[in-house]
């Protein structure tokens, strides 16, 4: 029997887990993952850190593990994303995930390699767009520069060329998240 205990989450795993976790293989890797999280909590507590900020990771883990059709790859992807951080950056990662959608934070990590400060993600994130051209058009429109331009001239603007100029300061992910490099 394995019991995973945290102030916000308690999961007790008995010898017969088939009703909760399905196959024996899933039971095995679920146990391994819960042991990994328990180890991380012990590390945090050994450093006299307040582990309450770790709650969102624990909740996400419990949610992932209790999903019937979650795959090992999905759990491992989650593990890879959060465990790449040392304890100094894990709190910023959690804070950023609380402020923004997890997918946005993960896209930022894919672009920058880490979350040094939660504010860096919040400041860099510009929104989600279909293309860099859409982002460029929105930026110009937000500045009010198109208000006095006749519609027929506006249609002649080459937004692709303008978007290319934005690539010096901004990047767009495959999911359309735009980040400012200069923040």
What are these regions (language model features)?
Residues 1-183:
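Acidic interaction surfaces
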């Amino acid at each position: 029997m394995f019991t995973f205990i945290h102030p916000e989450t308690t999961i007790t795993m008995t010898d017969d887990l088939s009703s909760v976790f399905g196959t024996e293989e899933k039971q095995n890797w679920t146990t391994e993952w819960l042991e990994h999280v328990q180890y991380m909590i012990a590390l945090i507590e050994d450093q006299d850190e307040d582990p309450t900020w770790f709650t969102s990771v624990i909740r996400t883990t419990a949610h992932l593990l209790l999903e019937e059709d979650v795959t090992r790859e999905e759990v491992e992807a989650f593990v890879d994303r959060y465990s790449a951080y040392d304890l100094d950056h894990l709190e910023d990662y959690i804070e950023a995930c609380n402020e923004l959608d997890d997918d946005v934070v993960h896209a930022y990590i894919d672009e920058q390699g880490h979350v040094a400060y939660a504010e860096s993600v919040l400041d860099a994130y510009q929104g989600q767009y279909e293309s860099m051209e859409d982002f460029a058009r929105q930026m110009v429109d937000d500045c009010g520069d198109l208000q006095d331009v006749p519609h027929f001239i506006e249609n002649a603007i080459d937004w692709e060329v303008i978007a290319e100029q934005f690539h010096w300061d901004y990047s767009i992910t495959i999911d359309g998240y735009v980040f400012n490099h200069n923040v």
